[in-house]
């Protein structure tokens, strides 16, 4: 992040001067925050969001109100009127959503208690944008002229309509798109959803990031969650980087030079007040002592919402001259993160208990369903990936957590939890997909135990050559079992038939391994015939030897 900021300063008006129209770039680059909030929304379904209500409306509200009150009081000690001080206090109480979320991700705070609390505070700050903007014309004494209650009521109705429409329309629309099987169309639809929800909220005069966050939450429990995240992630990273570069370009180093002492004092006071409030709230909430300062430091910088609020206040003539220079608050970012972010804790509490699957099952057809049901019955945490949308819809009707997506995409595996999982079970129908997945897992997720489905001996050879020893030939075991039952019907003792089955399995596996070097050789067919004769001879010899021995089961008949 610091690199992006320095790059922005270097190419901006106060650096080499390559870019002069910073405002246009800054407005466009805000889409990075919009995409980031959509992905954050995908990670929180409504039930989990409801579980955070205490921290959102408790700690979040307390942080905004206490910080705003203290900062407004300090501003009133200077030459600010009380109305301007209130607006200034609210603006400075906010934190930078983009910077704070990025810092929390870099430091691994997302799955800790402090990260959960930090996200709750940021979410409440986004919600507080609406009443804060509505407060400005009231403080300016122009409510009658500029505060149209009818218009506000219509915006509320439109907002509710968006929630209801999104709740009942998004999944059917994406189901129709996924049925086409064209990945590019799915990506285009995802971009349309994110940009459309952002522009709709912007038209209502609300936060674009809040709109995309809500869209993400509405789709968090859908079968398309991981595929949506994979489709949007490259755009999020690119635009978020542009956002930080544009912030660096917009820094007014001239104000810093002419008002250096005032800037330093302002930054120190702002940081000190917010750290004090955040630290006390973290202590009251019960956050571990080792995480309190980290939590307070990450959220103690100024936020981009101050630009919007202060420009609105200036248009209402609450501010005069150059009383405010909110852009300067961006300078505290990386210094604070280095000062207050200690080493990551090994005993961090998980944010979402089921967010780290033990097993990823790829493919949920007839073969994969048996494996999945067995794992679920034994309380294993699994994530199932399936690219047949009809199968996904059917399985979700019966309560299975199956997600739509092509598992041969590395980003999809990563978002599905491959980095935290212990094993992956590959049950693809196509051998090419199976081998491609094996290669991807060995290259990008070498810690995973790979278990695979082999349709026949050819696939079994390929898996063994690739180093996969845990596999199952789909017809082999069932055919052996039926063969054992056939031997019993022909008069063989059940125990003897069981022994015959085990012998055959062991000898066949040995022959399978011996044939690996000649798997692609032209003499494979003749060698297979020879091996089959050897197998019959060995099998017959061992079975005759067993018949000579006194069988323990026969003794008690």
Curated annotation (Swiss-Prot):
GO terms for biological process: proton transmembrane transport. This is Putative glutathione-regulated potassium-efflux system protein KefB. GO terms for cellular component: plasma membrane. It is a multi-pass membrane protein. The keyword Ion transport applies. Interacts with the regulatory subunit KefG. Keywords: Antiport, Cell inner membrane, Cell membrane, Ion transport, Membrane, Potassium, Potassium transport, Transmembrane, Transmembrane helix, Transport. NCBIfam families: 2a37 (TIGR00932), PRK03659.1 (NF002973). The lineage of its organism: Bacteria, Pseudomonadati, Pseudomonadota, Gammaproteobacteria, Enterobacterales. SUPFAM superfamilies: NAD(P)-binding Rossmann-fold domains. GO terms for molecular function: glutathione-regulated potassium exporter activity. It comes from Shigella flexneri. Gene3D superfamilies: 1.20.1530.20, NAD(P)-binding Rossmann-like Domain. Pore-forming subunit of a potassium efflux system that confers protection against electrophiles. Catalyzes K(+)/H(+) antiport. Residues 356-475 form the RCK N-terminal domain. It is found in: Cell inner membrane. The keyword Cytoplasm does not apply. Belongs to the monovalent cation:proton antiporter 2 (CPA2) transporter (TC 2.A.37) family. KefB subfamily. The gene is kefB. The chain crosses the membrane at residues 2-22, 24-44, 56-76, 84-104, 121-141, 146-166, 176-196, 199-219, 237-257, 260-280.
């Amino acid at each position: 992040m610091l690199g992006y900021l320095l790059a922005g300063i270097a190419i901006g008006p106060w650096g080499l001067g390559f870019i002069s129209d910073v405002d246009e770039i800054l407005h466009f680059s805000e889409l990075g925050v919009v995409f980031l909030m959509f992905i954050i929304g995908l990670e929180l379904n409504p039930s989990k969001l409801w579980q955070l209500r205490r921290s959102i409306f408790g700690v979040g509200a307390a942080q905004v109100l206490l910080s705003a009150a203290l900062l407004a009081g300090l501003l009133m000690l200077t030459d600010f009127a009380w109305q301007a001080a209130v607006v200034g206090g609210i603006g400075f109480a906010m934190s930078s959503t983009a910077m704070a979320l990025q810092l929390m991700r870099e430091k691994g705070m997302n799955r800790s208690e402090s990260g959960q609390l930090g996200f709750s505070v940021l979410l409440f700050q986004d919600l507080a944008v609406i009443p804060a903007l509505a407060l400005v014309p009231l403080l300016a004494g122009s409510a009658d002229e500029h505060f149209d209650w009818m218009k506000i009521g219509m915006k509320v109705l439109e907002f509710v309509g968006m929630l209801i429409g999104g709740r009942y329309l998004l999944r059917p629309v994406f189901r129709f798109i996924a049925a086409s099987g064209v990945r590019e169309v799915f990506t285009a639809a995802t971009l349309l959803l994110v940009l459309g929800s952002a522009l709709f909220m912007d038209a209502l005069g609300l936060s674009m990031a809040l709109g995309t966050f809500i869209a993400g939450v509405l789709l968090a429990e859908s079968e398309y969650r991981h595929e949506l995240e994979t489709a949007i992630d490259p755009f999020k990273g690119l635009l978020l980087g542009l956002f930080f570069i544009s912030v660096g370009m917009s820094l007014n180093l001239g104000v810093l030079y002419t008002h250096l002492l005032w800037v330093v004092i302002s930054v120190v006071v702002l940081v000190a007040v917010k750290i004090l409030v955040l630290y006390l709230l973290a202590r009251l909430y019960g956050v571990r002592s080792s995480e309190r300062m980290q939590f307070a430091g990450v959220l103690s910088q100024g936020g981009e919402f101050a630009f919007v609020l202060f420009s609105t206040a200036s248009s209402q003539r609450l501010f005069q001259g150059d009383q405010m220079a909110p852009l300067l608050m961006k300078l505290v970012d990386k210094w604070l993160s280095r000062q207050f972010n200690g080493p990551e804790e090994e005993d961090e509490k998980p944010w979402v208990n089921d967010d780290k699957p033990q097993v990823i099952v790829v493919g949920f057809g007839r073969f994969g369903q048996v494996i999945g049901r067995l794992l679920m019955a034994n309380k294993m945490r699994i994530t199932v990936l399936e690219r047949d949308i009809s199968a996904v819809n059917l399985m979700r009707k019966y309560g299975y957590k199956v997600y739509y997506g092509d598992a041969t995409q590395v980003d999809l595996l990563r978002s599905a939890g491959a980095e935290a999982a212990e094993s992956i079970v590959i049950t693809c129908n196509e051998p090419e997909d199976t081998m491609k997945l094996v290669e991807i897992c060995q290259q990008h997720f070498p810690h995973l135990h790979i278990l695979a489905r082999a349709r026949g001996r050819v696939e079994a050879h390929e898996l063994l050559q690739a180093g996969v020893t845990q596999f199952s030939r789909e017809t082999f075991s069932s055919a052996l079992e039926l063969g054992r039952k056939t031997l019993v019907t022909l008069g063989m003792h059940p125990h003897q038939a069981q022994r015959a089955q085990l012998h055959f399995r062991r000898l066949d596996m040995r022959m399978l391994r011996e044939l690996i070097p000649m798997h692609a050789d032209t003499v494979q067919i003749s060698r297979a015939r020879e091996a089959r004769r050897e197998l019959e001879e060995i099998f017959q010899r061992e079975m005759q030897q067993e018949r000579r021995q006194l069988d323990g089961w026969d003794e008690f008949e």
